[in-house]
Amino acid sequence: MTFVTLIKTILSAAVGAIALFSAVGADAADKVVVGYQTDALPSSVAIANGEFDKATGVKIDFRRFNSGAEIFAAIASGDVQVGYVGSSPFAAATSRGLDVKAFYLASISGVDEALVVRNGSGIETLADLKGKKLAAAPVSTDHYQLLALLKSLGLTEKDVKVFAIPQPDIVAGYNRGDLDGGFVWNPALDELRKNGKVLVTSKDVAEKGAPTFSAWVATDGFAKSHPDFLKAFAGVIAKYQSSFVADPAKWGPDSENAKALASLLGGTPADQAAGLRNLNLLPVKVQASDAWLGGGERSGLAKILKETAVFLKEQKKISDVLPSYAAFVTPDAVIAVEKGSGS
């Protein structure tokens, strides 16, 4: 399935499904479905221990997905109201007409995502990528950054074979020797490193002009109908993020937190602790600034979304770029959390 076909499939029922949810599904918020992924995040402990439910007063149905593209497909169908996604599928989905709002910035480009090349592939430096077979999850930030990296090197998909396949398939193909490398996040990142090395990180590619982020988004209808839910949800994320930053020892490989993450997400507690150390996190006060969620048209996130969309159009992955992406970003929840914390 091509990138464009996948996006069209994701969004084919988006307008009708979101409108239906807004009309009949969000009145009481007695049930909320939240999509998450396998990334190691401090707040995922709150999925495991039920603190999100307690804080919001809602029995949340948490569902795990393999990628942001899958989450946007579920949002478009009306099955999911809140989700954790990356900036590339976010830009693609909104460019196609899906109306969602980023209300919490989970992380920005760091070393938690990277291009790993296989031992024996003949790749020692970026100059060795020509003629190789690489992969990334479809419609993901990794896919976007892999293409952006190749462009910065003067290479195209004619020079390097790029496969857009799910992460489990990347790991399997890499281990068989069918792939020379993959741009991935955990747990695939740790799996690939067992027989390879990191060639370049997400942070490295961001510094070359292709920044990315991961964020929590909600459908526009849900965000308007349930601001208190989003505030409480964001408050839990901020609480666990602050705990991790203030006392990293409580999040080490032998900690209960790391064990909880491993139980929820897979891998070992040591894997999860290592993943946490690689995150690039921002406090809510910084998130609320114009550099990120605040500022309307000046919003840093809105600018990244547009820059990403422009690149995706150049690569013929989407057909349209919107004049502005400011409508898909809101600082309301993080501002409320900041005021509530007194910070």
Regions found by a protein language model. Give the residues of each.
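Sec/Tat signal peptide C-region and signal peptidase I cleavage site
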Residues: 22-28
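Pocket-lining segment of extracytoplasmic ligand-binding domains
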Residues: 88, 169-266
